[in-house]
Amino acid sequence: MPVAALIREEIEIPGNVSVEVNGSEVVVKSGAKVLKRELAFPGIEIKMENEKVVVESTFPKKNQTAMVGTYRSHIQNMIKGVSEGFEYKLVIRYAHFPMKVTFKGNTVIIDNFLGEKYPRTAKVMEGVTVKVNGEEVIVSGTNKEFVGQTAANIEQATKVKGRDTRIFQDGIYIVEKAGKVL
């Protein structure tokens, strides 16, 4: 089976975004928004060439070939995050006990879930904002992974345990993530 001598991925940089590569650290800026990420893997080189970010590996092994594509996706997500941002939409659903969802500090507080006495909490990751508009919760930010993790934390906080989920459908559910309707 022939093996490629060079795996190379190039990422275009939009005009309103600047990218700096310092060794294995990639810094993406657009206005006041800045994302930094350490992308280090043996045998993979990240560099700037002709206003493009180049991720390459010479005589790669299977895992290095996979990581070149992974790093390309990470850098593309960083560029999209600082230029457009990411947004997840969640909906609040309840049958009998109305839930009250509030955002305070770096936690989301869910009161009266299934009539429970004590509130449930969900951690909000750094750099992520949460807005509650009636029955809708909007999670937004520049880092795709942090926005997704925050939305997952909120959804997991209202997970029903020990009951039939076909009957007890109360909870907060992700309905749209990064522009894709689920």
UniProtKB/Swiss-Prot annotation:
GO terms for molecular function: rRNA binding; structural constituent of ribosome. It comes from the Archaea. It holds the Pfam family Ribosomal_L6. GO terms for biological process: cytoplasmic translation. Keywords: Ribonucleoprotein, Ribosomal protein, RNA-binding, rRNA-binding. InterPro entries: Ribosomal_uL6-like, Ribosomal_uL6-like_a/b-dom_sf, Ribosomal_uL6_a/b-dom, Ribosomal_uL6_arc, Ribosomal_uL6_CS2. One of its GO terms (cellular component) is cytosolic large ribosomal subunit. Belongs to the universal ribosomal protein uL6 family. Part of the 50S ribosomal subunit. This protein binds to the 23S rRNA, and is important in its secondary structure. It is located near the subunit interface in the base of the L7/L12 stalk, and near the tRNA binding site of the peptidyltransferase center. This is Large ribosomal subunit protein uL6. It comes from Methanococcus vannielii (strain ATCC 35089 / DSM 1224 / JCM 13029 / OCM 148 / SB). The lineage of its organism: Archaea, Methanobacteriati, Methanobacteriota, Methanomada group, Methanococci.
